Design a protein with these regions (language model features):
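Glycine-rich phosphate- or other oxyanion-binding loops that anchor nucleotides, phosphorylated ligands
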Residues: 1-159
Length: 159
């Protein structure tokens, strides 16, 4: 990003990695706060966060209000538990980096401590060429669109 801020509230939506073992794939996270791995914290816009939560409830979706971590890299293995112990429920790679007057987020857990993604998926064309990733590829093809659709439905209902 060029360092300039967006003029309004930006809504970050999409997939997240679950950090806590009690959060299955499909868990909706609508956080009050987001932080980066270096400790930079961002409080989410209260009005839009409330709108997203109300929308989730109207749709009959359960959600959690827990801190979201933004990381430069996939968080796997023992690092998941370490960040969970610090109070974070899920991790993405975008939200805390958004520069806007305000942000709000709706993220849906895809990978979990019980079902970690291979770091190969940071380069999907490379990951798909490795037979060890084919099982994950099929799982991702099924679950990623389903989870992304949940986030999209919440945003659509909040607008």
């Amino acid at each position: 990003m060029n360092g300039r801020s967006l003029p309004g509230v930006a809504i970050s939506a999409g997939l997240a990695g679950g950090l806590r073992s009690d959060l299955p794939t499909g868990t909706i996270v609508i956080p009050s706060a987001v932080a980066t791995t270096d400790g930079t914290a961002v409080v989410c816009d209260a009005v839009w966060t409330a709108r997203l939560r109300d929308a989730a409830q109207r749709l009959g979706y359960a959600y959690i209000d827990a801190a979201l971590l933004t990381s430069d890299a996939l968080v796997v293995g023992d690092a998941r538990a370490a960040w969970a112990a610090r109070g974070f429920a899920a991790v993405d790679m975008e939200t805390a980096r958004i520069r806007a007057r305000g942000i709000a987020a709706v993220r849906v857990v895809l990978d979990t401590p019980q079902r970690e993604l291979s770091p190969d998926w940071l380069n999907p064309s490379r990951a798909m060429r490795k037979p060890k990733n084919w099982g994950q590829m099929l799982w991702l093809a099924r679950e990623a669109p389903r989870c992304a659709d949940l986030a999209a439905r919440v945003i659509a209902a909040a607008l």
